[in-house]
């Protein structure tokens, strides 16, 4: 803002905030997050989450099984990364706590299966967005952006590698590193899965004794949690990947189920709705600042500056690798994943055509860069949503993921270099 407006930086900054609001993304995110907050509050206060956790703990009876079940659930909810991160975090955190799995480790597994499977399973909000973007910039197969997107999926190396790395971490083939290693040691020695420094609310989270919960809830059933979740996913798909419609349907079904079983009173539904919306205020404020930063980066010419650096070293075979490497870093520091793709797509496609490179490759690299940013950007919506659901600070969520994301990042660059030379 200072670079753009000088001494009038305050009014410049406010103008960029207004631009962020007028873009439409914020309004959508605010309403969607409010609906998620209501749904989570209803499921939590009615005991549906606790019952599901108690039921699931019979099968998730070890640390590895718990993380593997989290991984499978993450793959099964592929229609939207917001839905994935929020639902899986809410469902698994109590079971995870009972096995002294640090919240940062759970967050890594949850967020690692968020946008990653959304891009490689083409029935998702991400696939719909990028297929439209491909067509808009002339990247088609048989005149179809959707078919072009399908054709690009095998070249989306970052999400494929990330899912493999996740499995290897869960199995212990790849060791715990950095923040996760530190927090795992604390959890195993003290039973504290989230310290006051890490907790979003500054409250120490202790691992519960799930044996007693199962004993008290021997008839615990998963349906009060699973039925709203299935309705949410089903309506989302039937409504042309409209997560908002799915979320509203999930809220309605949850309310009916809980009222019918007398688990909650009508007045409590409205109280929980208010508390659910209130719980999302902080994340909405942070996302507003993040999208404002995207507007400022665009206005200051950051994308053009990046391109000016890339031009002297561009080579046709290296284009996909360079696009991924630089755009992933841009997403990590500058924020904006879909926004980043919209900024760089009109630059990347003409460059690919001019250098004689199949535009599917750099376009796949752009998708990968978006996913890398989504997994790691500290103020990004994916990290923020997961952090809120798991009650941990976004910084620790990012730092827990970062070492493994770097592994996927470096291996993806190697894959893009190899494929770039093979397809030139």
Regions found by a protein language model. Give the residues of each.
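Alpha-helical transmembrane segments of multi-pass membrane proteins
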Residues: 63-77, 101-127, 142-161, 180-183, ...
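C-terminal transmembrane helix pair
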Residues: 99, 140-141, 156, 284, ...
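Membrane-embedded alpha-helical segments and adjacent helix-loop junctions characteristic
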Residues: 7-107, 265-354
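Hydrophobic transmembrane alpha-helices of multi-pass small-molecule transporters
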Residues: 1-32, 155-159, 170-171, 187-292, ...
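Juxtamembrane and boundary regions of transmembrane helices in multi-pass small-molecule transporters
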Residues: 117-207, 368-424
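Juxtamembrane inter-helical linkers in multi-pass membrane proteins
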Residues: 58, 62, 90-107, 182-210
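Alpha-helical transmembrane segments of multipass membrane proteins
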Residues: 38, 75, 167, 233-237, ...
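Hydrophobic alpha-helical membrane segments of integral membrane proteins
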Residues: 1, 84-89, 160-161, 245-250, ...
């Amino acid at each position: 803002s200072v670079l753009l407006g000088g001494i009038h930086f305050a009014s410049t900054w406010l103008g960029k905030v207004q631009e962020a609001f007028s873009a439409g993304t914020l309004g959508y995110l605010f309403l969607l997050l409010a609906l998620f907050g209501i749904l989570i509050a209803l499921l939590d206060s009615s005991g549906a989450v606790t019952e599901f956790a108690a039921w699931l703990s019979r099968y998730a009876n070890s640390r590895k099984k718990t993380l593997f079940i989290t991984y499978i659930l993450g793959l099964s909810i592929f229609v939207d990364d917001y839905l994935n991160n929020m639902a899986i975090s809410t469902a698994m955190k109590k079971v995870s706590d009972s096995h002294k799995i640090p919240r940062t480790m759970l967050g890594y597994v949850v967020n690692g299966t968020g946008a990653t499977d959304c891009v490689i399973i083409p029935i998702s909000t991400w696939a719909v967005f990028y297929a439209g973007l491909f067509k808009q910039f002339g990247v088609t197969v048989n005149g179809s952006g959707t078919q072009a997107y399908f054709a690009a999926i095998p070249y989306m190396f970052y999400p494929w590698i990330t899912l493999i790395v996740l499995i290897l971490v869960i199995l212990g083939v790849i060791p715990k590193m950095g923040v996760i290693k530190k927090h795992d040691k604390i959890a195993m020695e003290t039973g504290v899965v989230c310290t006051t420094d890490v907790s979003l609310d500054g409250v120490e989270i202790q691992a519960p004794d799930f044996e007693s919960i199962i004993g008290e809830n021997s008839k615990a059933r998963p349906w009060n949690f699973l039925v709203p979740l299935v309705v949410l996913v089903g309506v989302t798909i039937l409504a042309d990947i409209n997560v908002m419609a799915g979320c509203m349907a999930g809220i309605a079904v949850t309310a009916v189920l809980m009222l019918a079983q007398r688990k909650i009173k009508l007045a409590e539904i409205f109280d929980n709705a208010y508390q659910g919306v209130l719980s999302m205020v902080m994340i909405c404020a942070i996302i507003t600042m993040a999208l404002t930063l995207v507007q400022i980066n665009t206005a200051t010419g950051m994308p053009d500056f990046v391109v000016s650096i890339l031009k002297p070293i561009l080579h046709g075979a290296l284009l996909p690798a360079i696009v991924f490497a630089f755009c992933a870093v841009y997403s990590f520091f500058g924020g904006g994943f879909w926004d980043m793709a919209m900024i760089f797509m009109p630059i990347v496609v003409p460059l690919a055509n001019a250098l004689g490179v199949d535009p599917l490759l750099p376009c796949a690299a752009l998708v990968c860069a978006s996913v890398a940013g989504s997994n790691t950007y500290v103020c990004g919506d994916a990290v923020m949503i997961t952090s809120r659901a798991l009650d941990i600070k976004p910084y620790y969520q990012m730092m827990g993921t970062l070492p493994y994301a770097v592994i996927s990042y470096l291996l993806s660059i190697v894959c893009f270099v190899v494929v770039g030379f093979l397809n030139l």
